[in-house]
Regions:
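Secondary-structure junction motif
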Residues: 1, 7-29, 93-101, 108-113
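Beta-alpha-beta core module
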Residues: 3, 43-92
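Short aromatic/hydrophobic contact patches that present stacked aromatics
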Residues: 8-10, 36, 84-86
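Short beta-strand-to-loop elements that line the ligand-binding cleft
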Residues: 11-12, 32-41
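Residue-level recognition of oxygen-bearing side chains
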Residues: 17, 41-44
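Primarily hydrophobic membrane-targeting regions of prokaryotic envelope proteins
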Residues: 26, 37, 46-47, 103
Length: 113
């Protein structure tokens, strides 16, 4: 990640958990990121990276089963996050809840450890 120290960065807005995590990853790599672009829209992150205007830390899920269009670099330490759903016990068997959980499981399967 140190090679990205001299590049412009795109990150989520200040105050978000993902921004805090990304800044900490940069600091652990020994640099303060030069954040020139800020947006919560991860598709905008991808477009800025594709155009060569910025580098970014993006979750694997953004590629949605399609091949990446930019060079990917694996981060040290195998960082990951856990996604979960919760419902009231009485609502857990509702068809809409079951459908959403099944769709999430299918969508996340390609990037799950």
């Amino acid at each position: 990640m140190g090679e990205a120290a001299e590049h412009a960065w795109v990150m989520e807005p200040r105050g978000t958990a993902s921004r805090h995590w990304a800044e900490q990853q940069c600091r652990l790599a020994g640099f303060e990121p030069d954040v020139r672009f800020e947006t919560a829209d991860l598709q905008a992150h991808i477009r800025l990276v594709e155009a060569g205007h910025a580098v970014a830390l993006l979750p694997d899920l953004v590629w949605g089963g399609r091949p990446p269009t930019v060079e990917l670099v694996t981060l040290a330490g195998d960082p990951h996050r856990t996604l979960f759903t919760s419902t009231r016990t009485a609502a857990a068997a509702r068809p809409a809840i079951v459908a959403v959980r099944e769709l999430l499981a299918r969508a996340l399967a390609p990037v799950s450890p």
